[in-house]
Amino acid sequence: MDAAQLKADIVLLIDLITEHSRKVELVTHEDLQDEFLSKAPLQQPIPVSQIKAEYEAIPEMERKLRNKADDSPEEKERRRLISRRQMFGSLFSGELSLADLKEEPAEAESAPREITPEYFETVLAEVLKGQYGIEDLTSWDSKHYYHFSPLLSASYARLLSTQNNPYEQILDTVRESSRVYPRPVGVFTFEFAPFRIDPTVIQ
């Protein structure tokens, strides 16, 4: 297996999950596989010059986004940038440690690769094994989801995974509140965002 290509595919998979979390939504295992199988055939190894340029540009970009509210778009983007730089530093440590970067020859476009579900599982295993901010969870109805934790916390991800079952949503929220704080949850809480559960269902 080509190491440079595998790293590029890892970045692609992380980006796919991140985009869903940016939209405040989870992605199922099946949907993620479909997206990867659709986009990966054209994914090329990432040039070292591109890696270094983005890695070195992130600190200044992150600095400009500091001192914003925790739930603001700017703060979320700042967290994404920090995680992305950590990902580059971990995944491309060898490439980034090169003392002198020579001009890379332009690569000719290659034909689309054949990507199998088995290869998707290989890339996914590498993503989950690394510290890239990608987390998985299994919902009450045994569906498997993924999310990017710097943009979508584990507790909010669990909340999203119960949206198709208001009873489970209430139970999970009460359990989580009791575990973390602990404190009771007012019954009227569930009538408002992000729950918006019908009062008749709550009662």
Descriptions of predicted regions:
Residues 1-203:
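C-terminal non-catalytic scaffold/interaction domains in large multidomain proteins
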